[in-house]
Regions:
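An N-terminal alpha-helical hairpin/helix-loop-helix interaction module that forms a charged
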Residues: 1-132, 148-235
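Contiguous, well-ordered alpha-helical segments that form the cores/surfaces of helical PPI scaffolds
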Residues: 139-146
Length: 235
């Protein structure tokens, strides 16, 4: 790995920290989204909700993290859960969120099983609604919302470009060749580099109010560095 390139990207992230978190860009929304999900998902109050209602309430702060003008995966989950509540809930609780004891290969297998299963639900319930489709970015975002200390959000283009720029040296892969352990390994290296940046961490904690998830693992911050490097052309 090219440590100098990694540190340069983190420095550019730090130099632009106030700008990317201003009212226009508001990248800190990711921490609000996780806090919202955690507060809803693990609350006793949701016991009386349907799964569709629970998921909708939990993801209401996700904003552009998953949805945009072309796709609406979170709304898709809600709509599919209204049609097949038991199956959609099973796919989340017993498959995607299943305890894997830290086994990343098993976690990746669970993700693929979840995606196959939820696509089958979509084909049965909304066959012409491609915007309700789910992908790895969706699945790993749901995992990061559910267990942020153990997971990283994943986006293919951002991960590939970051890995190339820091000369990671391990192929993350894509499609059938995707390797979760390789991606998480790269993110772990970003976390290690962030932990020795006290000035940046101080800036970050200063804007993390009560409405934000307190990311002790720095997993969200690591993804934010990877994401913002591409989104704001730090390369």
């Amino acid at each position: 790995m090219n440590t100098a390139n990694l540190n340069t990207l983190i420095q550019r992230y730090e130099d632009n920290f106030e700008w990317i978190n201003n009212a226009e860009h508001d990248e800190i929304f990711k921490w609000r989204a996780v806090r919202c999900f955690q507060d809803v998902w693990f609350s006793e109050e949701v016991e009386d909700m349907t799964f569709a209602e629970k998921f909708k309430a939990a993801t209401k702060e996700c904003s552009v993290l998953l949805d945009n003008g072309q796709v609406s995966p979170t709304n898709g989950i809600v709509k599919m859960a209204e049609q097949e509540p038991d199956e959609v809930e099973r796919l989340f609780v017993e498959v995607l969120f299943a305890d894997d004891q830290g086994n990343l290969q098993l976690r990746q297998d669970h993700v693929e099983e979840f995606l196959d299963g939820i696509e089958a639900v979509r084909e049965r319930t909304f066959p012409s609604y491609w915007k309700y489709g789910q992908n790895r970015h969706c699945a790993f975002t749901y995992l990061a919302l559910y267990a942020p200390e153990e997971n990283y959000i994943y986006k293919y283009s951002e991960a590939e470009e970051f890995a190339k720029h820091i000369e990671y040296g391990i192929d993350i892969g894509s499609g059938q060749t995707f390797k979760l352990s390789a991606y998480y390994g790269m993110c772990d290296l970003v976390v290690d580099a962030l932990r020795i940046r006290p000035a940046l961490l101080e800036k970050h904690w200063a804007i993390c109010g009560d409405e934000c998830y307190h990311d002790d693992s720095l997993h969200l911050l690591a993804f934010d560095v990877i994401y913002c490097s591409r989104a704001y052309n730090f390369y």
